[in-house]
Amino acid sequence: MPIKIPTELPAFKVLSNENIFVMNDSRAKTQDIRPLKIAILNLMPKKILAENQLLRHLSNTPLQVEVKLIQTKSYVSQNTPIEHLEKFYTYFDDIKEEKFDGLIITGAPVEQMEFEDITYWNELTEIMEWSKSNIFSTLHICWGAQAGLYYHYNIPKYKLENKISGVFSHWVNDENADLTRGLDDVFHVPHSRHTEVKKEDINKISELEILSESKEAGIFIVATKNRRKIFFMGHPEYDRNTLKEEYLRDREKGDDVEIPQNYFVDNDINSTPKFTWRGSSNIIFGNWLNYCVYQNTPYDINEISE
């Protein structure tokens, strides 16, 4: 979908240079169709980078997508210019009377903390509760997925002995499932986390199903059977160099971290990482937008309800 974003947003230039179709407001108004309204609750520290990654995957298909960027009020990002936040972001209080076709809740580097100890936890739970009646399909990513499973289903996270970091092979559990339609028998997805959720906990919830998993990385995609809530345990949105940048950051902090698996050529951190998940990621995000959102959301957005 051509994505409707402000011309001044850094992602506009980045995506245009990649030959991805982006649309400014004036052009969007000349198309007599209802755009999909997608909100992004961006909890990542480097918000501009996360914007670029997610908007890239929401772009370049036949329909319009109108994006609203949301930041938390209870915690102000220390890694994104305040001018950028003031210009392009809004607060939940400003949009909570609206309805959206989709919501993306990103990951955040807070997974080793207890959920209730996180500064913005109360605000996040208010948003997740609101999403049940104001969002048609909510996509939770990595820590956002763990937070969503904990809030909605009381599914805990467990600390791993060693951080999972790398690009891992996955399989599809149901080849007829809409979210995984078109994926190869074996496909790759990056993971980067210190915690996990367990299969036996998810299997106790009849409303949930595990659509994809990995021998090395564990569960990847969990979804409600009606697709109103989707949970990605990995990071299909990551760019080629994101895992590298995270590894170098952790090493500079003095953390005892291993080189991301199946990523660098011959484990040489000076090499250009292998980008082996771009195709599968495009399919996964496209499937969410098409099958979980566009094909089922009501034409009158005000009809969205729990």
UniProtKB/Swiss-Prot annotation:
Say which family it is in: Belongs to the MetA family.
List the protein's name: Homoserine O-acetyltransferase
Q: Where in the cell is it found?
A: Cytoplasm
Tell me the enzyme class. transferase
Taken from the record, one Pfam family name reads: HTS
Q: Where is this site: Important for acyl-CoA specificity?
A: E111
Coarse class of the protein's main subcellular location = cytoplasm
Q: Which Gene Ontology BP terms does the record give?
A: L-methionine biosynthetic process from homoserine via O-succinyl-L-homoserine and cystathionine
Q: Which GO terms describe its cellular component?
A: cytoplasm
Domain of life of the organism encoding this protein: Bacteria
The EC number(s) given in the record are 2.3.1.31
Q: Which InterPro entries match?
A: Class_I_gatase-like, HST_MetA, MetA_family
Please list the reactions this protein catalyses.
L-homoserine + acetyl-CoA = O-acetyl-L-homoserine + CoA
Positions of the catalytic residues: C142, H235, E237
Question: Has UniProt tagged this entry with the keyword Acyltransferase?
Answer: yes
Q: Is Transferase included in the keywords of this UniProt record?
A: yes
Coiled-coil segments, which residues? none
Lineage runs: Bacteria, Bacillati, Bacillota, Clostridia, Eubacteriales
- What is a GO molecular function of this protein? homoserine O-acetyltransferase activity
Query: Membrane-spanning regions, if any?
Result: none
Q: What does this protein do?
A: Transfers an acetyl group from acetyl-CoA to L-homoserine, forming acetyl-L-homoserine.
Q: Where is this site: Important for substrate specificity?
A: S192
Q: What does the record give as its pathway?
A: Amino-acid biosynthesis; L-methionine biosynthesis via de novo pathway; O-acetyl-L-homoserine from L-homoserine: step 1/1
Gene3D superfamilies named in the record = 3.40.50.880
